[in-house]
């Protein structure tokens, strides 16, 4: 696909089975779904490494089931606990910290690296995989939000490939197959609208953590569930689309589609639109990437159009859910603003989950952090990992200070 962020995997990789997998974030929602995909067709895959952040017991159970030679945990203090939970006679090499994740991402024997860490924490490992020329099944959208230009450059230097796991971008990727991207008129990202679609400001002022986590269609982790409720998830996906498909911002649109059956669409210059439809289950997109170009059995029930009945669409309410527009402004503004947007959002979401701020404070904090960044002098292009993560760290501190001042 011309203009795509990376070369596609070559013929040798396409035919390589069983395929050696490194799963970064194996204990999260995407990681556990990926292992369910592997379970159905174990002859096609070999688990080489598993990495988890906090759920050491689940990581130990996964490791006992697949016996990979490498494991990783973020917290070095958890390594001994993990080792103690493993079956007798099984002694994998246990890596720790971000360095451990980066080591796994670049393992010479790895055919495919699933980047499924949550948030900016996934950047270093994604970049390490790109530097090593790996095929990356990318679920960590923040890597592109923070460093899309850097990852594009690395992929074209090393031959690394990116296959998008996000359901929307996986849909677009599929809709572009066999077509010239130059003939694409626009990308249409669909959004469920989240749990608060149709609610008014009065209701949003007092929503609880539990209400915000209750997504109507998808089973997801806490952070992405809140991002869906604020529409920030869709804002991040707009930025992701621009990087993945080299699309101008004005060619990426968002439409609310409450049923989450159409996962996204591509419109071509002849007026036609190609949509990807399916049951809202992440195993479909995960299997598409892990098994590329083979279409695999996933265990997902096929879509029954008669049961679905009707599909509806509406415009997003930007006045109630300004995060979508903040993301557009961040991408258009450049100069590190996408990094600020993401870092401020991660801090604000965490504060909301702790009960420290209200739901409507999330976009207010993000906007305040972006304004503070705009007001400061800058001498950095934020196009390398260290400068990006320095800005990320600074923004987290500024956002926490802003939240304290508001409190």
UniProtKB/Swiss-Prot annotation:
Residue positions binding NADPH: 27-30, 53-55, 140, 142, 221
Required cofactor names: Mg(2+); Mn(2+)
Pfam family, one: DXPR_C
Entry's Gene Ontology molecular function annotations: 1-deoxy-D-xylulose-5-phosphate reductoisomerase activity; manganese ion binding; NADPH binding
Keyword set includes Metal-binding: yes
UniProt binding sites for 1-deoxy-D-xylulose 5-phosphate: 141, 167-168, 192, 215, 228, 233-234, 237
Gene3D superfamilies reported for this sequence: 1.10.1740.10, NAD(P)-binding Rossmann-like Domain (3.40.50.720)
Disulfide bonds, paired cysteine numbers: none
EC number of the protein: 1.1.1.267
Signal peptide: none
Pathway: Isoprenoid biosynthesis; isopentenyl diphosphate biosynthesis via DXP pathway; isopentenyl diphosphate from 1-deoxy-D-xylulose 5-phosphate: step 1/6
EC class of the enzyme, as a word: oxidoreductase
Chain residues that bind Mn(2+): 166, 168, 237
One record GO biological process: isopentenyl diphosphate biosynthetic process, methylerythritol 4-phosphate pathway involved in terpenoid biosynthetic process
Catalytic activity: 2-C-methyl-D-erythritol 4-phosphate + NADP(+) = 1-deoxy-D-xylulose 5-phosphate + NADPH + H(+)
This protein's UniProt keywords: Isoprene biosynthesis, Manganese, Metal-binding, NADP, Oxidoreductase
HAMAP family per record: DXP_reductoisom
Chain's role: Catalyzes the NADPH-dependent rearrangement and reduction of 1-deoxy-D-xylulose-5-phosphate (DXP) to 2-C-methyl-D-erythritol 4-phosphate (MEP).
Family stated for the protein in its record: Belongs to the DXR family.
Protein name per its UniProtKB record: 1-deoxy-D-xylulose 5-phosphate reductoisomerase
């Amino acid at each position: 696909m011309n203009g795509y962020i990376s070369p596609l995997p070559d013929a040798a990789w396409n035919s390589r089975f069983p395929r050696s997998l490194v799963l970064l974030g194996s204990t999260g929602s995407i990681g556990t779904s990926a292992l369910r995909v592997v379970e159905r067709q174990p002859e096609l895959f070999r688990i080489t490494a598993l990495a988890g952040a906090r759920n050491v017991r689940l990581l130990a159970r996964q490791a006992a089931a697949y016996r990979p030679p490498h494991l990783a945990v973020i917290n070095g203090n958890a390594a001994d606990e993990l080792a103690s939970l493993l079956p007798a006679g099984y002694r994998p090499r246990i890596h720790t910290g971000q360095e451990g994740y980066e080591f796994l991402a670049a393992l010479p024997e790895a055919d495919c690296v699933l980047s499924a860490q949550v948030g900016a924490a996934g950047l270093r490992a994604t970049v390490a995989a790109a530097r090593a020329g790996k095929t990356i099944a990318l679920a960590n959208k923040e890597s592109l939000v923070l460093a899309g230009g850097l990852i594009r450059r690395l992929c074209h230097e090393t031959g690394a490939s990116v296959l998008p796991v996000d359901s929307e971008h996986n849909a677009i990727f599929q809709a572009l197959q066999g077509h010239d991207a130059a003939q694409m008129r626009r990308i249409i990202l669909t959004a469920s609208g989240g749990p608060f679609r149709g609610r008014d400001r009065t209701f949003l002022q007092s929503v609880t953590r539990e209400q915000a986590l209750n997504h109507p269609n998808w089973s997801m982790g806490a952070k992405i569930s809140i991002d869906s409720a604020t529409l920030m998830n869709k804002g991040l996906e707009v930025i992701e689309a621009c990087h993945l498909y080299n699309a101008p911002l004005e060619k990426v649109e968002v439409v609310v589609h409450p049923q989450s059956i159409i996962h996204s669409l591509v419109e071509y210059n002849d007026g036609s639109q190609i949509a990807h439809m399916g049951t809202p289950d992440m195993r479909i997109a995960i299997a598409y990437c892990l098994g590329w170009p083979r279409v695999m059995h996933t265990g997902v029930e096929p879509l029954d159009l008669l049961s679905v009945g009707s599909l509806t669409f509406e415009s997003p309410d930007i006045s109630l859910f300004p995060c979508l527009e903040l993301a557009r402004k961040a991408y258009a503004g450049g100069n590190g603003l996408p990094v600020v947007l993401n870092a401020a959002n991660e801090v604000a979401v965490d504060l909301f989950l702790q009960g420290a701020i209200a739901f409507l404070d999330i976009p207010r904090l993000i906007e305040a952090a972006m304004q503070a960044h705009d007001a400061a002098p800058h001498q950095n292009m934020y196009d390398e990992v260290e400068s990006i993560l320095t800005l990320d760290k600074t923004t987290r501190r500024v956002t926490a200070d802003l939240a304290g001042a508001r409190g």
